[in-house]
């Protein structure tokens, strides 16, 4: 897999369609394309942030494995989300788009109600959305940014999960997107890093609450991945992060989506309260 060009920047929240080369959704680093084997046959998935990046790759991969989906997107990301829907429908599965922000509890409940109406039930919940902006010092983070980052990155996980979990049966799975930054403490993403630490703790606590009900709760903590989130956050000289990665390159969305899939399906049936670390070789001490 070739190194990712380091010259691209976008305005927030970034567009999947504008990245060149296009991030890999289903093709692995050895050139092999993901082949479905029914791991999510007839399952119903609610996935937030399915318009681009990791969420897009996971949505298409889940469809290839047999799942119907509801995905969420921001209004300005609708075009990308419609491409995701088209890709899912090509896999012979159904996809519905819920458009809006998830920084308010009412919106999160509306999303879950929409998903239940379209899907009938929820087998897999993937909390995937995130917001981040660079700030070099705590003094540069105003209350508005702190509030938005927390409401998007962890409050939404709580609100969506709270609304959905009573509709999930034994054998269901929840996958939360954390980050390597929860473990290494990136200094220019203090608010974002703080929310990712909260997601790790949320995952562990919730897993202990619902293990007795047969509902598994896990997280994935990606390292630097080639997505619009990165290109719309950092200046171009900081986008190429491969010199920080033992494997010498940024990851591709497919390489995180496969972790989501493992945790969502019965392959990960003995996993709960855990975090997977697709980060290119950075050693993490949990």
From Swiss-Prot:
Listed GO biological process terms: fatty acid metabolic process
A GO cellular component annotated for this chain's UniProt record is: nucleus
The active site is formed by 178 (proton donor), 192 (proton acceptor), 196 (lowers pka of active site tyr)
Q: Which GO terms describe its molecular function?
A: 3-hydroxyacyl-CoA dehydrogenase activity
Instruction: Enumerate the Gene3D superfamilies for this protein.
Output: NAD(P)-binding Rossmann-like Domain
Write the record's keywords in alphabetical order, separated by commas.
NADP, Oxidoreductase
| Residues that coordinate or bind NADP(+) | 54, 128, 162, 192, 196, 225, 227
Work out whether the entry's keyword set contains Transferase. Answer: no
Q: Which CDD domains match?
A: SDR_c1
Q: PROSITE patterns in the record, alphabetically?
A: ADH_SHORT
The top EC class is: oxidoreductase
Q: What is its EC number?
A: 1.-.-.-
List the PANTHER family hit by this protein, alphabetically.
NADPH-DEPENDENT ALDEHYDE REDUCTASE-LIKE PROTEIN, CHLOROPLASTIC-RELATED, OXIDOREDUCTASE, SHORT-CHAIN DEHYDROGENASE_REDUCTASE FAMILY (AFU_ORTHOLOGUE AFUA_4G05870)
The record's comment on protein family reads: Belongs to the short-chain dehydrogenases/reductases (SDR) family.
Mind telling me what this protein is named? Uncharacterized oxidoreductase C4H3.08
Q: Which organism is it from?
A: Schizosaccharomyces pombe (strain 972 / ATCC 24843) (Fission yeast)
């Amino acid at each position: 897999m070739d190194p990712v060009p380091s010259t691209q920047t976008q305005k927030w929240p970034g567009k999947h369609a504008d990245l060149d080369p296009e991030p890999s959704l289903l093709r692995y680093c050895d050139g092999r394309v993901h082949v479905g084997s029914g791991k999510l046959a007839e399952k119903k998935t609610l996935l937030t942030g399915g318009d681009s990046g990791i969420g897009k790759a996971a949505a298409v991969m889940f469809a290839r494995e047999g799942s119907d989906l509801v995905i969420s997107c921001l209004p300005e990301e609708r075009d990308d989300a419609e491409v995701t829907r088209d890709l899912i429908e090509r896999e012979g599965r159904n996809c519905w788009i819920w458009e809006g922000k998830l920084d308010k509890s009412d919106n999160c409940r509306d999303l879950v109600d929409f998903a239940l109406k379209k899907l009938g039930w929820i087998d897999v919940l993937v909390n995937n959305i995130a917001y981040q902006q660079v700030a070099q010092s705590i003094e540069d983070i105003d209350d508005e940014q702190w509030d938005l980052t927390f409401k998007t990155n962890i409050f939404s996980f709580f609100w969506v999960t709270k609304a959905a979990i009573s509709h999930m049966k034994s054998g269901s799975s929840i996958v939360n997107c954390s980050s390597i930054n929860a473990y290494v403490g990136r200094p220019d993403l203090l608010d974002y890093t703080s929310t990712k630490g909260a997601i790790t703790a949320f995952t562990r606590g919730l897993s202990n609450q619902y293990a007795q009900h047969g509902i598994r709760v896990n997280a994935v903590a990606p390292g630097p991945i080639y997505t619009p989130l990165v290109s719309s956050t950092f200046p171009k000289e900081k986008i190429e992060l491969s010199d920080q990665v033992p494997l010498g390159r940024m990851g591709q969305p497919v390489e995180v989506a496969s972790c989501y899939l493992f945790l969502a399906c019965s392959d990960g049936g003995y996993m709960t309260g855990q975090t997977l670390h697709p980060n290119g070789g950075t050693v993490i001490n949990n």
